[in-house]
A protein has these predicted regions:
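N-terminal cap/lid segment of alpha/beta-hydrolase-fold proteins
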Residues: 1-31, 83
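Short beta-strand element of the alpha/beta-hydrolase
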Residues: 32-41
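Catalytic nucleophile-loop/oxyanion-hole region of alpha/beta-hydrolase
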Residues: 48, 69-104, 223
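Short amphipathic alpha-helix adjacent to the substrate-entry channel of hydrolases
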Residues: 49-67
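Primarily recognizes the serine-hydrolase "nucleophile elbow" in alpha/beta-hydrolase
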Residues: 88-160, 249-250, 254
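Short beta-strand/loop motif that positions the catalytic acidic residue
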Residues: 161, 167-169, 173
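Conserved alpha/beta-hydrolase "acid-adjacent" motif
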Residues: 174-183
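C-terminal catalytic histidine-bearing segment of alpha/beta-hydrolase fold enzymes
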Residues: 193-273
Length: 273
Protein backbone atom coordinates (compact mmCIF):
# COMPACT_ATOMS: atom_id res chain seq x y z
CA UNK A 1 0.00 0.00 0.00
CA UNK A 2 1.15 3.52 -0.80
CA UNK A 3 0.35 6.70 1.10
CA UNK A 4 0.40 10.10 -0.55
CA UNK A 5 -0.40 13.48 1.05
CA UNK A 6 -1.42 16.24 -1.35
CA UNK A 7 -1.86 19.90 -0.42
CA UNK A 8 -5.01 21.22 -2.08
CA UNK A 9 -4.97 24.69 -0.53
CA UNK A 10 -1.90 25.77 1.39
CA UNK A 11 -3.43 28.97 2.77
CA UNK A 12 -6.39 27.11 4.27
CA UNK A 13 -4.34 24.01 5.20
CA UNK A 14 -6.51 21.73 3.10
CA UNK A 15 -4.93 18.33 2.44
CA UNK A 16 -5.93 15.07 0.80
CA UNK A 17 -4.34 11.85 2.05
CA UNK A 18 -4.54 8.93 -0.37
CA UNK A 19 -4.22 5.31 0.75
CA UNK A 20 -3.65 3.29 -2.41
CA UNK A 21 -3.64 -0.50 -2.70
CA UNK A 22 -2.13 -2.66 -5.41
CA UNK A 23 -4.16 -4.25 -8.18
CA UNK A 24 -3.55 -7.26 -10.42
CA UNK A 25 -0.51 -9.40 -9.57
CA UNK A 26 -1.57 -11.26 -6.44
CA UNK A 27 -4.87 -9.39 -6.73
CA UNK A 28 -5.54 -11.00 -10.10
CA UNK A 29 -9.30 -10.49 -9.99
CA UNK A 30 -9.02 -6.75 -9.28
CA UNK A 31 -7.91 -4.61 -12.27
CA UNK A 32 -9.28 -1.46 -10.59
CA UNK A 33 -10.94 -0.55 -7.31
CA UNK A 34 -13.80 1.68 -6.20
CA UNK A 35 -12.93 4.54 -3.86
CA UNK A 36 -14.28 6.32 -0.81
CA UNK A 37 -13.55 9.85 0.41
CA UNK A 38 -13.60 10.33 4.21
CA UNK A 39 -14.74 13.67 5.69
CA UNK A 40 -14.06 13.80 9.45
CA UNK A 41 -16.30 15.75 11.80
CA UNK A 42 -15.37 18.48 14.24
CA UNK A 43 -18.04 21.17 14.12
CA UNK A 44 -16.25 23.00 11.29
CA UNK A 45 -13.66 23.91 13.95
CA UNK A 46 -11.34 20.95 13.34
CA UNK A 47 -11.10 17.66 11.45
CA UNK A 48 -11.18 14.95 14.10
CA UNK A 49 -8.41 12.35 14.01
CA UNK A 50 -10.90 9.83 15.44
CA UNK A 51 -12.98 10.03 12.26
CA UNK A 52 -10.07 10.05 9.81
CA UNK A 53 -7.63 7.12 9.65
CA UNK A 54 -9.66 4.85 11.99
CA UNK A 55 -12.50 5.16 9.48
CA UNK A 56 -10.24 4.67 6.47
CA UNK A 57 -8.87 1.32 7.62
CA UNK A 58 -12.08 -0.79 7.49
CA UNK A 59 -12.72 0.36 3.92
CA UNK A 60 -9.12 -0.40 2.98
CA UNK A 61 -9.63 -3.88 4.38
CA UNK A 62 -12.76 -4.18 2.24
CA UNK A 63 -10.65 -3.39 -0.83
CA UNK A 64 -11.33 0.29 -1.48
CA UNK A 65 -8.87 3.00 -2.40
CA UNK A 66 -9.41 5.45 0.47
CA UNK A 67 -8.91 9.20 0.70
CA UNK A 68 -9.11 11.45 3.76
CA UNK A 69 -9.88 15.13 3.22
CA UNK A 70 -8.94 17.69 5.83
CA UNK A 71 -11.11 20.56 4.65
CA UNK A 72 -11.36 24.24 5.64
CA UNK A 73 -12.25 24.88 9.29
CA UNK A 74 -12.58 27.77 11.75
CA UNK A 75 -12.52 31.15 9.97
CA UNK A 76 -11.78 29.41 6.68
CA UNK A 77 -15.01 27.39 6.86
CA UNK A 78 -17.02 30.26 5.39
CA UNK A 79 -19.42 28.59 2.98
CA UNK A 80 -18.95 27.45 0.24
CA UNK A 81 -15.22 26.99 0.89
CA UNK A 82 -15.57 23.52 2.49
CA UNK A 83 -17.67 22.39 -0.48
CA UNK A 84 -15.04 23.81 -2.83
CA UNK A 85 -12.47 21.71 -0.95
CA UNK A 86 -14.60 18.61 -1.55
CA UNK A 87 -14.97 19.44 -5.25
CA UNK A 88 -11.22 20.00 -5.59
CA UNK A 89 -10.55 16.64 -3.93
CA UNK A 90 -13.06 14.80 -6.13
CA UNK A 91 -11.70 16.55 -9.23
CA UNK A 92 -8.21 15.36 -8.37
CA UNK A 93 -9.27 11.81 -7.52
CA UNK A 94 -11.20 11.40 -10.77
CA UNK A 95 -8.46 13.03 -12.84
CA UNK A 96 -5.93 10.53 -11.47
CA UNK A 97 -8.26 7.53 -11.61
CA UNK A 98 -6.16 5.70 -14.18
CA UNK A 99 -2.94 6.25 -12.24
CA UNK A 100 -4.57 5.29 -8.94
CA UNK A 101 -6.35 2.26 -10.45
CA UNK A 102 -9.83 3.58 -9.68
CA UNK A 103 -13.27 3.28 -11.23
CA UNK A 104 -13.95 7.03 -11.60
CA UNK A 105 -17.73 6.57 -11.45
CA UNK A 106 -17.57 4.37 -8.33
CA UNK A 107 -16.33 6.84 -5.71
CA UNK A 108 -18.40 7.25 -2.55
CA UNK A 109 -18.16 9.77 0.27
CA UNK A 110 -18.49 9.23 4.03
CA UNK A 111 -18.82 12.02 6.58
CA UNK A 112 -19.45 12.41 10.30
CA UNK A 113 -21.25 15.18 12.18
CA UNK A 114 -20.16 18.43 10.45
CA UNK A 115 -18.26 16.24 7.99
CA UNK A 116 -21.59 14.51 7.45
CA UNK A 117 -23.06 17.88 6.57
CA UNK A 118 -20.31 18.33 4.01
CA UNK A 119 -20.90 14.80 2.67
CA UNK A 120 -24.61 15.58 2.44
CA UNK A 121 -23.81 18.79 0.59
CA UNK A 122 -21.58 16.79 -1.75
CA UNK A 123 -24.49 14.45 -2.45
CA UNK A 124 -27.00 17.23 -3.10
CA UNK A 125 -25.27 20.34 -4.43
CA UNK A 126 -21.65 19.65 -5.41
CA UNK A 127 -20.23 20.12 -8.88
CA UNK A 128 -18.79 16.58 -8.71
CA UNK A 129 -21.33 14.49 -6.84
CA UNK A 130 -20.30 11.12 -5.41
CA UNK A 131 -21.76 7.80 -6.51
CA UNK A 132 -23.01 7.13 -2.97
CA UNK A 133 -22.96 8.88 0.40
CA UNK A 134 -22.64 7.53 3.95
CA UNK A 135 -23.77 10.02 6.60
CA UNK A 136 -22.91 9.37 10.24
CA UNK A 137 -24.78 11.32 12.96
CA UNK A 138 -24.73 14.15 10.46
CA UNK A 139 -26.03 17.68 10.99
CA UNK A 140 -28.26 18.10 7.95
CA UNK A 141 -30.95 20.67 8.69
CA UNK A 142 -30.81 24.26 9.93
CA UNK A 143 -29.07 23.02 13.12
CA UNK A 144 -25.84 23.41 11.15
CA UNK A 145 -26.08 27.16 11.85
CA UNK A 146 -25.01 26.33 15.42
CA UNK A 147 -21.50 25.47 14.24
CA UNK A 148 -21.27 27.32 10.93
CA UNK A 149 -23.67 30.23 10.41
CA UNK A 150 -22.84 30.42 6.72
CA UNK A 151 -23.60 26.76 5.94
CA UNK A 152 -26.92 25.81 4.29
CA UNK A 153 -29.45 23.16 5.22
CA UNK A 154 -28.75 20.01 3.25
CA UNK A 155 -32.29 18.71 3.74
CA UNK A 156 -33.57 21.57 1.59
CA UNK A 157 -31.11 20.73 -1.20
CA UNK A 158 -32.17 17.11 -1.83
CA UNK A 159 -33.21 16.69 -5.47
CA UNK A 160 -33.76 13.96 -8.05
CA UNK A 161 -30.01 13.81 -8.74
CA UNK A 162 -29.04 13.12 -5.12
CA UNK A 163 -27.07 9.88 -4.92
CA UNK A 164 -28.16 6.84 -2.86
CA UNK A 165 -27.49 7.39 0.84
CA UNK A 166 -26.73 5.31 3.94
CA UNK A 167 -27.51 7.00 7.25
CA UNK A 168 -26.72 6.00 10.83
CA UNK A 169 -27.23 7.81 14.12
CA UNK A 170 -28.15 7.38 17.77
CA UNK A 171 -31.62 8.21 19.05
CA UNK A 172 -30.09 9.78 22.18
CA UNK A 173 -27.42 11.91 20.46
CA UNK A 174 -27.26 14.99 22.69
CA UNK A 175 -25.41 17.17 20.18
CA UNK A 176 -27.05 16.55 16.80
CA UNK A 177 -30.78 15.82 17.26
CA UNK A 178 -32.10 12.72 15.50
CA UNK A 179 -34.47 15.00 13.58
CA UNK A 180 -31.55 15.74 11.25
CA UNK A 181 -31.43 12.13 10.08
CA UNK A 182 -35.22 11.74 9.99
CA UNK A 183 -35.81 14.92 7.98
CA UNK A 184 -33.13 13.93 5.49
CA UNK A 185 -34.69 10.48 5.07
CA UNK A 186 -38.06 12.11 4.45
CA UNK A 187 -36.52 14.38 1.81
CA UNK A 188 -34.91 11.38 0.11
CA UNK A 189 -38.25 9.59 0.16
CA UNK A 190 -40.03 12.57 -1.41
CA UNK A 191 -37.56 12.43 -4.30
CA UNK A 192 -37.69 8.62 -4.56
CA UNK A 193 -33.95 8.31 -3.79
CA UNK A 194 -32.77 4.91 -2.59
CA UNK A 195 -31.51 4.89 0.99
CA UNK A 196 -30.78 2.68 3.99
CA UNK A 197 -30.91 3.97 7.56
CA UNK A 198 -29.96 2.69 11.01
CA UNK A 199 -31.13 4.63 14.07
CA UNK A 200 -29.79 2.98 17.22
CA UNK A 201 -31.70 3.15 20.49
CA UNK A 202 -28.97 4.84 22.52
CA UNK A 203 -25.42 6.07 22.24
CA UNK A 204 -23.33 9.25 22.33
CA UNK A 205 -22.47 11.68 19.58
CA UNK A 206 -19.20 11.05 17.79
CA UNK A 207 -18.86 7.29 18.24
CA UNK A 208 -16.87 6.86 15.00
CA UNK A 209 -16.20 3.15 14.36
CA UNK A 210 -16.92 2.33 18.04
CA UNK A 211 -13.58 0.58 18.54
CA UNK A 212 -12.07 0.86 22.02
CA UNK A 213 -9.28 2.95 20.49
CA UNK A 214 -11.72 5.75 19.64
CA UNK A 215 -14.04 5.58 22.67
CA UNK A 216 -13.79 6.48 26.33
CA UNK A 217 -13.77 3.38 28.52
CA UNK A 218 -17.06 4.36 30.18
CA UNK A 219 -18.97 5.05 26.96
CA UNK A 220 -22.52 3.71 27.11
CA UNK A 221 -23.95 2.70 23.76
CA UNK A 222 -26.05 0.07 22.05
CA UNK A 223 -24.00 -3.08 21.41
CA UNK A 224 -25.10 -3.10 17.77
CA UNK A 225 -23.80 0.37 16.87
CA UNK A 226 -20.47 -1.04 15.58
CA UNK A 227 -22.49 -2.99 12.99
CA UNK A 228 -22.85 0.16 10.91
CA UNK A 229 -19.36 -0.36 9.50
CA UNK A 230 -20.02 -3.80 8.02
CA UNK A 231 -23.55 -2.79 7.04
CA UNK A 232 -22.26 0.22 5.10
CA UNK A 233 -19.68 -1.90 3.28
CA UNK A 234 -22.39 -4.37 2.30
CA UNK A 235 -24.63 -1.50 1.20
CA UNK A 236 -21.86 -0.05 -1.00
CA UNK A 237 -21.64 -3.39 -2.76
CA UNK A 238 -25.40 -3.21 -3.36
CA UNK A 239 -25.34 0.29 -4.87
CA UNK A 240 -21.94 0.30 -6.61
CA UNK A 241 -21.50 -3.37 -7.50
CA UNK A 242 -18.86 -5.93 -6.55
CA UNK A 243 -15.32 -5.46 -7.84
CA UNK A 244 -13.50 -8.71 -7.05
CA UNK A 245 -14.63 -10.67 -10.09
CA UNK A 246 -12.48 -9.19 -12.84
CA UNK A 247 -14.70 -6.14 -13.33
CA UNK A 248 -17.45 -4.24 -11.53
CA UNK A 249 -20.68 -6.21 -11.38
CA UNK A 250 -24.05 -4.58 -11.92
CA UNK A 251 -25.53 -2.97 -8.79
CA UNK A 252 -28.50 -4.78 -7.28
CA UNK A 253 -29.95 -1.62 -5.77
CA UNK A 254 -30.66 1.32 -8.05
CA UNK A 255 -30.57 5.08 -7.69
CA UNK A 256 -34.32 5.37 -7.29
CA UNK A 257 -36.61 3.45 -4.97
CA UNK A 258 -39.36 3.06 -7.57
CA UNK A 259 -39.01 0.22 -10.03
CA UNK A 260 -40.60 2.49 -12.64
CA UNK A 261 -37.59 4.82 -12.54
CA UNK A 262 -34.85 2.26 -13.30
CA UNK A 263 -34.06 -0.70 -15.47
CA UNK A 264 -33.04 -2.73 -12.42
CA UNK A 265 -33.94 -2.80 -8.74
CA UNK A 266 -33.72 -5.55 -6.16
CA UNK A 267 -36.79 -6.65 -4.25
CA UNK A 268 -34.79 -6.57 -1.02
CA UNK A 269 -33.86 -2.95 -1.60
CA UNK A 270 -37.44 -1.95 -2.39
CA UNK A 271 -38.81 -3.67 0.69
CA UNK A 272 -36.12 -2.10 2.90
CA UNK A 273 -37.21 1.45 2.25
Amino acid sequence: MEKEVIVLNEARKVTLTAYLQDVEGEFGNIPKRPGILVLPGGGYQMCSDLEADPVAFPYLKAGYQVFVLRYSVKKDALWPQPLEDYDAAMDLIRSRAQEWKLYPDKIAVIGFSAGGHLAGAAATMAKNRPAAAILGYAVLNEDVKGCNKSAPSVVDAVDDDTCPCFLFASRTDNLVPIANTIEFMQALDRHDISFESHVYAYGPHGFSTCDSSVQDKDTNMCDRIPDWVADSIGWLKDVLGDFGKGSMTKPVCGHYASGDREAYLSVDCTMGL
